[in-house]
Amino acid sequence: YAYQYAAFILYSAYILAKRTFKKRYDLVYVHNMPDVLVMSGLFPKLVGAKVILDQHDPMPELMRTIYNLDEHSMSVRIICWLEKWSLARANLVLTVNKACERLFSERGCPIEKIGVVMNSPDEKIFSYREARPSLSSSKSGDPNKHFVVMYHGSLVERNGLDLAVEALARVRETIPNVELRVFGRSTPYLEQVLQRAKELGIEKHVRYLGSRQLEDLVPEIDACDVGVIPNQRNAFTDINTPTRIFEYLASGKPAIAPRTPGILDYFDAQSLFFFEAGDVAELATRIVDVYSDSSRAFEVAQRGQKMYVAHAWQQEKQTLLKLVSGLLQ
């Protein structure tokens, strides 16, 4: 990573500097990772260009989570210093939610220099559809109808698919026809989770259906009863607002998500089903809640959709355009 990052930063800095002599840039838009890629825009900035640093993922928190690093370790301290240096070089810092805005502000970036543009689903793919009441297998009169819990996304430990499998084992007696459908690119972690499902005797209740294009996920979401975001608690998931929540809500499906700052900034218990991050028992309880009370699940999904509408990409796009326009004026 270090070699690739360094090579790309130097090459991009050279290209931008060379082109600046021919035609000056008004704006250089830098998207992390790494944060220090902002270095490539320094020469254009010297001759008048504005530099935006788009911080989608705070690197210290992400590296701590991926590599299980202590926050006081030398590696994390270096990454924090590089982040602070990079934030200072930008004219405008963009980030994805209020939690990251607070984080960067606490690390010395002036709050007035930070803009929030949320990660919103593409409305051309995840178009808004009003929530509709659904019936569980016990209430529909069809004993063959599965109660479908859906997970889609990266199959890595921090996203907690193992918690969903453990929760499924707990709810099987209450929901005999429960089925967990999993979508995402196969990883060694997934193999561990599927092996655990066998050990728990629920392998027939867990279906891994492979990776899907975004367009192909929509009918799968339509076919589920509830979407689950079973994140483990860690430095990164604490500040993350998963786009998957909005993807479920766009289709009118209730979602179960961890009670973390990055999510609580936007949702409450009236618009999402919450569990304590890492708590299998509470996650299982929330799955049963959705199954047992379809009327409440419908109402919660309806209220959650209001937040989806408020932060749909058409709204967020206008926020981005206003921030850029204000910077260039």
Positions of PLM-derived features:
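Membrane-proximal helix-turn-helix segments that form the acceptor-binding/catalytic region
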Residues: 13-17, 36-47, 53, 59, ...
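Carbohydrate-associated surface elements
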Residues: 99, 120
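Nucleotide-activated donor-binding/catalytic signature segment of Leloir-type glycosyltransferases, i.e.
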Residues: 191-216
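Conserved acidic donor-binding segment of nucleotide-sugar-dependent glycosyltransferases
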Residues: 269-280, 289-294
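A short, well-ordered alpha-helix in the C-terminal region of glycosyltransferases
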Residues: 282, 289, 296-310
